[in-house]
Amino acid sequence: MREVISMHVGQAGVQMGNACWELYCLEHGIQPDGQMPSDKTCGGGDDSFNTFFSETGAGKHVPRAIFVDLEPTVIDEVRTGIYRQLFHPEQLITGKEDAANNYARGHYTIGKEIIDIVLDRTRKLADQCTGLQGFLIFHSFGGGTGSGFTSLLMERLSVDYGKKSKLEFAVYPAPQVSTAVVEPYNSILTTHTTLEHSDCAFMVDNEAIYDICRRNLDIERPSYTNLNRLIGQIVSSITASLRFDGALNVDLTEFQTNLVPYPRIHFPLATYAPVISAEKAYHEQLSVADITNACFEPANQMVKCDPRHGKYMACCLLYRGDVVPKDVNSAIAAIKTKRSIQFVDWCPTGFKVGINYQPPTVVPGGDLAKVQRAVCMLSNTTAIAEAWARLDHKFDLMYAKRAFVHWYVGEGMEEGEFSEAREDMAALEKDYEEVGTDSVGEEDEEGEEY
């Protein structure tokens, strides 16, 4: 079996986790108490969904997941919520005091008190696996726990499970709206620390998802539940090939192989289509070509940046539902003829396709319409450098005045870590710039680079 363990860190990670597991349960017909009437093989059968759920002798299905937060309120909602029987109490780990939006608290002072418990529980989950494939880590960049504790966890997971892949789903600070003043500090510190430990990081930003909810679903004031359910659909699409049998299945390492050309350039953009409300879907039939084209619209992206200014290095199209390879091929051929979509010259083909026959499931009473087919596109484009540049600029404005730095130093960090992290980010921006430049005629100087 190729099991995957999900780690949900901090408020954002936990709330994304709630949305994801709610959706997984619906997709597999697992009830909130973990029973699965449709499952005939009692005890650990070799069904595809066992990558995400372990089975007890009593026929209960338990998510292979760990929820961690340094303060209890958010996880307490899971403990008392509708899915409280789904999780083993040991999978829900909370501290007493929160990280207070401070990376240093999450990574050093408060985080180190809880990290050993988390790793111990992770070890228990890993021991139940026959062939652990890797970890999915859900967190935000802006919060103290999401940034600080995640980076500590990633470092420790690298030590304990060296070769296992680690994929992140990270909430990137939105360009305009912000939940914390110190988001740029936390984001840059966490990106720097986890850069060498993460194999692939899918970023979503709240503002981009707000806009999608407003524009496509006509929700005037989207709540976090609306946002998380949309993120849940994306995560579900990415993991569908691990949980169902399909025509072209994609496993965790395959994503990395196809999306990550250089170890540091591992931040693909996610785009999902169709995002459409039930009223509209009733009146239109969306073909494979329609949803494929929608993926190349910047408006449907989960991070605010414009791929038309950048170049694509790799692109992964994950279809689910009523899709046949012939339709996909013609849709891709049509895309390739468009001038607005540019690939780097050293990656001529650039499309990887996955097809899964399980149609997308929607949460009853949710905002998304039930559709016959959907696609999630993961593209590694140089345009994401815009997002880093934006963040670096905000960091610079604050750091020039050393604003708020004393909170970090007071928790045992050194000021040198800030400048080190910022230099690493500058290098990352430069890496993206170099990857985007055409390779012809520059081979001689580039030789010693990689």
UniProtKB/Swiss-Prot annotation:
Residues annotated as signal peptide: none
Annotated InterPro entries: Alpha_tubulin, Tub_FtsZ_C, Tubulin, Tubulin/FtsZ-like_C, Tubulin/FtsZ_2-layer-sand-dom, Tubulin/FtsZ_GTPase_sf, Tubulin_C, Tubulin_CS
GO molecular function terms listed in the Swiss-Prot or TrEMBL record: GTP binding; hydrolase activity; metal ion binding; structural constituent of cytoskeleton
Keywords from the UniProt entry: Acetylation, Cytoplasm, Cytoskeleton, GTP-binding, Hydrolase, Magnesium, Metal-binding, Microtubule, Nucleotide-binding
Region of interest called Disordered, as start-end residue ranges on this chain: 431-450
Binding site for Mg(2+): E71
EC number: 3.6.5.-
Residues reported to bind GTP: Q11, E71, S140, G144, T145, T179, N206, N228
SMART domains: Tubulin, Tubulin_C
Broadest EC class assigned to this enzyme: hydrolase
Active site per the UniProt annotation: E254
PROSITE patterns with a match to the protein in the record: TUBULIN (PS00227)
Record-stated family: Belongs to the tubulin family.
Role of this protein: Tubulin is the major constituent of microtubules, a cylinder consisting of laterally associated linear protofilaments composed of alpha- and beta-tubulin heterodimers. Microtubules grow by the addition of GTP-tubulin dimers to the microtubule end, where a stabilizing cap forms. Below the cap, tubulin dimers are in GDP-bound state, owing to GTPase activity of alpha-tubulin.
Protein name in UniProt: Tubulin alpha chain
Organism field: Oncorhynchus keta (Chum salmon)
